[in-house]
């Protein structure tokens, strides 16, 4: 029995091959994370030239700050809305395209197009559509007697950023769901139909369990996307307003760290956000993965 493990002539060659990736990880991930941990227990001046060790004081001030707690709850609500609706809509579209025989390539192309749009551009696009004075969608809403102004209404502002974020992420989810659906053997689906199972029953009892690994992967990816990668959308669409109703944790870190030059507070918020994402990921792997069928 032969081993498939590669054998290197030089003992140092494997380390040289891994070195570039290790350097990238250390420089762009481990070193910034270590700096954030260090700054979170320091009281830094606005330019970072002098510091004083304060222990957990920065964290205590954060959890006694009602504005920070509001942004914490806003982040949780926003993230679950983006991840939930993004995955449901993508799965629905993928199932429709997988079912359609004619012009399926055209539908795939149209659905994938938003993936090529930059997040800030996606936000501006939806801002124009929902512009209170010139927007096409707001014009039809006005005909129905509904007044739209996301610059003054917190609920409308949240709807706008969730809509733009979901629209931007649909293409990514769609590609994975469609590939998973097309990998299911047609013989299994046909056998279920012969046994008398209807389309809905076949989907929930046969198709959905078979694509559960992809669904679990996308759940993790979408939550991380909602926590971090939606910053350009929020910044371009609402800038965290009105009255901080769309200020998520990542945007609050930017506002206090880069705009307000409060490096200690922003570092403490970065640590909390990092721990929150790690905690949610561990929970998903600990409990949600149990229901994933890899067979």
From Swiss-Prot:
Keywords: Cell inner membrane, Cell membrane, Membrane, Transmembrane, Transmembrane helix, Transport. It is found in: Cell inner membrane. PROSITE patterns: ABC_TM1. Pfam families: BPD_transp_1 (PF00528). CDD domains: TM_PBP2. The chain crosses the membrane at residues 12-32, 77-97, 110-130, 158-178, 208-228, 263-283. This is sn-glycerol-3-phosphate transport system permease protein UgpA. It comes from Pectobacterium atrosepticum (strain SCRI 1043 / ATCC BAA-672) (Erwinia carotovora subsp. atroseptica). The gene is ugpA.
């Amino acid at each position: 029995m032969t081993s498939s493990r590669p054998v290197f002539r030089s003992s140092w060659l494997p380390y040289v091959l891994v070195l570039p990736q290790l350097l990238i990880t250390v420089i762009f991930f481990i070193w910034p994370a270590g700096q954030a941990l260090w700054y979170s227990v320091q009281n830094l001046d606005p330019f970072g030239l002098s510091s004083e060790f304060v222990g957990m004081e920065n964290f205590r001030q954060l959890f006694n700050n009602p504005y920070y707690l509001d942004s914490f709850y806003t982040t949780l609500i926003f993230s679950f809305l983006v991840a939930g609706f993004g995955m449901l809509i993508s799965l629905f579209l993928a199932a429709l395209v997988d079912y359609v025989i004619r012009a399926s390539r055209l539908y795939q192309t149209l659905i994938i197009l938003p993936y090529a749009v930059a997040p800030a551009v996606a936000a501006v696009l939806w801002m124009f559509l929902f512009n209170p004075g010139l927007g096409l969608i707001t014009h039809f809403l006005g005909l129905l007697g509904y007044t739209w102004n996301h610059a003054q209404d917190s609920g409308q502002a949240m709807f706008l950023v969730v809509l733009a974020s979901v629209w931007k992420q649909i293409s990514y989810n769609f590609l994975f769901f469609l590939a998973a659906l097309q990998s299911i053997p047609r013989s299994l689906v046909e056998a279920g139909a012969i046994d008398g199972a209807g389309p809905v029953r076949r989907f929930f009892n046969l198709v959905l369990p078979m694509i559960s690994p992809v669904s679990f992967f996308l759940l993790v990816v979408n939550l991380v996307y909602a926590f971090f990668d939606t910053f350009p959308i929020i910044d371009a669409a609402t800038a965290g307003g009105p009255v901080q109703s769309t200020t998520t944790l990542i945007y609050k870190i930017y506002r206090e760290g880069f705009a307000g030059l409060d490096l200690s507070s922003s570092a403490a918020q970065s640590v909390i956000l990092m721990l929150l994402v790690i905690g949610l990921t561990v929970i998903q792997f600990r409990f949600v993965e149990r229901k994933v069928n890899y067979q």
